[in-house]
A protein has these predicted regions:
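Hydrophobic/aromatic beta-strand patches that form the interior of the parallel beta-sheet core
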Residues: 49, 91, 112-113, 135-137, ...
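Short, charged/polar "capping" segments at the starts of alpha-helices
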Residues: 29-32, 55-62, 99-100, 144-148, ...
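N-terminal pre-catalytic "stem/leader" segment of glycosyltransferase-like enzymes
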Residues: 1-85
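Extended catalytic core of nucleotide-activated donor transferases of GT-like folds
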Residues: 34, 58-129
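Structural motif
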Residues: 19, 23-28, 51-55, 88-89, 92-95, 110, 115, 135, ...
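A nucleotide-sugar donor-handling region in carbohydrate enzymes
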Residues: 1-4, 132-195
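Active-site donor-nucleotide binding/catalytic segment of nucleotide-sugar enzymes
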Residues: 9, 14-29, 120-122, 175-195
Length: 195
């Protein structure tokens, strides 16, 4: 029932709330997407619709006038949601879009992959794990170099690659520096490990 209700709720979301959609497989993804949402909501004053498959994701109760959250648990309705999704931009930390059960929408959507792993794109993941994305927010130049090489080798269309960094790691490093300077009480919640 929860999946159907979530799917139905998303279908009722107004178009201006579907300009930027962020999909999270679990609440643990928040470590990687929080900084992006903060910039979108606070700095750029952009509405964000957050879709999670985690029924216990604390962001389902987050209150902000530019943030809305919907839960669509894994299963038939999540697959249907991905297949028929209407959105301008969808940001995910989930690799293998279009390779496994979750496919790109039949509607025009710009898909952005937000890396959560620091490692190589071809040493651990499937060779085509990132092929379905239109843009990728890369951790650093190594991702850009590897993805460009794959585009060249596979005669793929050139995608938008950005050296975005790794907000979770940067937050932890910032917290460590603050701790060393005796400022541990000034660290943000983003730097606090989950309990």
């Amino acid at each position: 029932l929860q999946a159907w209700l979530g799917w139905r709720s998303y279908r009722k979301v107004a178009a201006d709330w579907r300009k930027i959609v962020i999909y999270s497989e679990s609440g643990q993804d928040w470590h990687y997407i929080e900084a992006l949402i903060e910039v979108l909501n606070h700095d750029l004053q952009q509405k964000v619709t957050y879709v999670t498959s985690d029924q216990n994701d604390p962001r389902l109760s987050r209150r902000h006038h530019l943030f809305g959250a919907i839960c669509i648990p894994e299963g038939f309705f999540l697959t249907l949601h991905f297949n028929m999704q209407k959105a301008d931009v969808v940001v995910l930390t989930m690799m293998d879009l279009d390779n496994l059960q979750l496919k790109k929408s039949i509607n025009p959507v710009h898909y952005i992959y937000l890396f959560h792993a620091l490692g190589s794109t071809h040493m651990v993941d499937h060779a085509n794990s990132y092929d379905a994305y239109d843009s990728l927010f890369c951790v650093g130049p190594h991702h850009v170099e590897e993805l460009r090489k794959r585009e060249s080798m596979q005669a793929m269309q050139t995608r938008n690659l950005f050296e975005y960094g790794h907000p979770r790691l940067e937050s932890l490093l910032s917290a460590a520096r603050a701790y060393e300077q005796g400022l541990e009480h000034e660290t943000s919640d983003a730097a606090t490990p989950p309990v």
